[in-house]
């Protein structure tokens, strides 16, 4: 993209050249859970068990990212066994639960994976996510994120959290890196 202000047409709508340029360099995608991978609702069973719904299209996008050399990590404020199980199913090995200060987990990931902040994308939905989002190369807010987060993000998804917003981000990263066609036809 040579012209400032130019954009790329995607199946999700136009994406600015600046966002595409940032997405080209991403090697680690960090995701929140509640409000990003799920719709933010927590269902409580009669025996106190916690239930959440996860979108299979998000799962497919995550698997495509992982098989295209983009690491995926979860940093979430809550702790739930079902999140651990979902990560195991998808092949996500970097899971940080119960994080009231997400910067601690973020710093640990950077050190563990030897990745610079500019090579990280973070997808969040609420103000707890902003301290990490302001440090990464590509900050993403889901469409239904907190109103104060949306204008601060580099990119806002067209799709709401829990409704395949993560898939939109994965597709964007793969498209920017010229890997989207390679990801077609994979199975999860």
What function would you assign to each model-found segment?
Residues 25-27, 70, 118-119:
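Short coil/turn segments at beta-strand junctions that form active-site/ligand-binding loops
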Residues 51-55, 88-90, 94-96, 103-188:
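Mg2+-dependent phosphoryl-transfer enzymes with acidic/Ser/Thr/Gly-rich catalytic loops
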Residues 23-42, 133, 166:
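Asp-based phosphoryl-transfer active-site loop
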Residues 1-31, 179-188:
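Non-catalytic pre-domain segments flanking phosphatase-related domains
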Residues 33, 77-78, 99, 143-146:
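Short secondary-structure boundary segments
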Residues 38-44, 83-90:
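Short, basic/glycine-rich phosphate-binding loops at helix/coil junctions
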Residues 41-64:
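Basic, amphipathic juxtamembrane/active-site segments
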Residues 36, 62-86, 96-97, 133:
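Substrate-recognition element of Asp-dependent hydrolases with the DxDx(T/V) motif
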């Amino acid at each position: 993209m040579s012209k400032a202000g130019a954009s790329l047409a995607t199946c999700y709508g136009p994406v600015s050249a600046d966002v595409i340029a940032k997405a080209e360099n991403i090697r680690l995608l960090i995701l929140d859970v509640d409000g990003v991978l799920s719709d933010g609702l927590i269902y409580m069973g009669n025996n106190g068990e916690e239930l959440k719904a996860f979108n299979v299209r998000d799962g497919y996008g995550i698997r495509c990212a992982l098989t295209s050399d983009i690491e995926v990590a979860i940093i979430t404020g809550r702790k739930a066994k079902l999140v651990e199980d979902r990560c195991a199913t998808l092949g996500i090995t970097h899971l940080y639960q119960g994080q009231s200060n997400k910067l601690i987990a973020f710093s640990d990931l950077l050190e563990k994976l030897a990745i610079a902040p500019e090579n990280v994308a973070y997808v969040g939905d609420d103000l707890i996510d902003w301290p990490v989002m302001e440090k990464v190369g590509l900050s993403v807010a889901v469409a239904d994120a907190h109103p104060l987060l949306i204008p601060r993000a580099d990119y806002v998804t067209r799709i709401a959290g829990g409704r395949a917003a993560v898939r939109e981000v994965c597709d964007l990263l793969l498209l920017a890196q010229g890997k989207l066609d390679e990801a077609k036809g994979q199975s999860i």
